[in-house]
Amino acid sequence: MKRYAQMKKIIEFFNSPKISRMGEYMLTGRYIMVLFALASVFVIFDISVAGVLTFACITGITLVLCEDLLAPFPPFLFLCLIGTKCYNSFSVFIQYKALGVVLIICVIMHFVLHWKKPVLKGFLTLPMIFVSAAVILGGVGFISKREYFSGASIFYILALGVGMLLLYTVFNTHINVHKDYSLMDKLSLIMVIIGCFGTFMVASYYLTHINEVIDTKTILYFQWRNNCSTFLMLSIPFAFYRGNKKSYSIMFGFLFYFAILLTGSRGGLVFGVIELMMCCILFFLYDRERRFAYIAILACICFALMIFSREFLSFFGYTFDRLMSAINGVLVGEQKEGR
């Protein structure tokens, strides 16, 4: 009985008004900008491993303290972005396996201390069930029994089939538990700040190697460009979403795409511009009051590109050359297969 009473007191403490207010503060733009400033220190001094470990600790602490599962999302994203620079670092991080155990305990503690009755009926529950069924049964009749029950196949079935359904149920239960804020507003704020941090990482790298940029007059190669480009692409639609209420947020979308160009990612070059076009078209169609303002912004950008087209193509030409080379390689391969 004593242990039960102690456990009850601990749960009551972590669900007290003071802890709840702390959790609410961890979802504010001010707090996320504090995390931005901290993450910037690790980027500037190029101590990525220390940055990953620090934000892993912050994520774990936030999981224990906060009832809302959205609160640990910002530090986790900062962790992921800093971690993109830690290429082939398994031998480094395996030394901190004890921290991994602690983080798993933090995840378990979150669900124990902030237990909620699972919300089984969500907006996407039925589609997720159909997707899970398709993943589980998709190979039946097409692959052999041995292939179907292989380790890799079982992993994908459990992770992408059952796992994604369970993950959706968990997030549907534990995100936005208080219902006193707009989930999309908070999520868009987080993603725009993360996009700004990704842009900062790219800008910081270029400033660090500015002499090389001046000498070569072209973009720089860095290993983490594709991963960083992915985060920037994820952030573009959220910048436009916030632009519905704050017009200046739209400029962040163009800034993120410019950062994608600086990464030299071919996928980012192509799919990023598709994202921008889709977002712009939606704004032209539905935001009639500011339609002329958007046209003016695009006209200025196009005019600037026309004036500096030679310099633009010269600086970013390496990415375009790699893209055309990849396309030619695919076409040649298809021609050989046709023969």
Give each language-model segment a name.
Residues R3, I10-V112, G138-I143:
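N-terminal signal-anchor transmembrane segment
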Residues K9, L137-F155, K179-Y181, I193-T230, ...:
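Membrane-interfacial helix-loop-helix modules of multi-pass inner-membrane proteins that assemble, modify
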Residues I44-F45, G60-L69, V107-P118, L167-D180, ...:
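Structural signal for the C-terminal ends of transmembrane alpha-helices
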Residues F45-G51, F90-L99, A152-I157, T218-L232:
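Membrane-interface micro-motifs in multi-pass membrane enzymes
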